[in-house]
């Protein structure tokens, strides 16, 4: 068997998967592209195992191990995407980069004065200490905002 055929096919599969990871914005499509890249690696492992005529067939054994890891990865990845979709209402990667911590920091005005005992008061009533840790009532206000 010529090694060039599966190697070229694996390179094409890997490039298509890499393009999908870099160009797609949907988290599920990114996971599918990662799986495509893993399948390209598996094809290379089997092709080189056959080409080298390894008596232990370590390439094929490693391929089985990689398939098991990929199955676990896609299961956990889809569970995370589903949980994020339920909480945020979207699975677009660009919209998921903003976390709640950066949103809270952006709501503070620049001229917010320092309150008593080294705390900063936010417009919504949340207080943070001088070290940046939330005060006692920060959790209560976040729950009230979530119910609105």
Curated annotation (Swiss-Prot):
Catalysed reaction equations from the record: a quinone + NADH + 5 H(+)(in) = a quinol + NAD(+) + 4 H(+)(out)
Recorded topology in the membrane: Multi-pass membrane protein
Recorded GO MF terms: NADH:ubiquinone reductase (non-electrogenic) activity; quinone binding
EC number per UniProt: 7.1.1.-
One biological process term in Gene Ontology: ATP synthesis coupled electron transport
One Pfam match: Oxidored_q2
Main location per the UniProt record: membrane
Subcellular location(s) per record: Cell membrane
Alphabetically ordered keywords of this record: Cell membrane, Membrane, NAD, Quinone, Translocase, Transmembrane, Transmembrane helix, Transport
Top-level enzyme category: translocase
An annotated GO cellular component: NADH dehydrogenase complex
Region (Disordered): 96-148
Domain of life: Bacteria
Spans through the membrane: 3-23, 28-48, 64-84
Family: Belongs to the complex I subunit 4L family.
Subunit relationships: NDH-1 is composed of 14 different subunits. Subunits NuoA, H, J, K, L, M, N constitute the membrane sector of the complex.
Protein purpose: NDH-1 shuttles electrons from NADH, via FMN and iron-sulfur (Fe-S) centers, to quinones in the respiratory chain. The immediate electron acceptor for the enzyme in this species is believed to be a menaquinone. Couples the redox reaction to proton translocation (for every two electrons transferred, four hydrogen ions are translocated across the cytoplasmic membrane), and thus conserves the redox energy in a proton gradient.
Official protein name in the record: NADH-quinone oxidoreductase subunit K 2
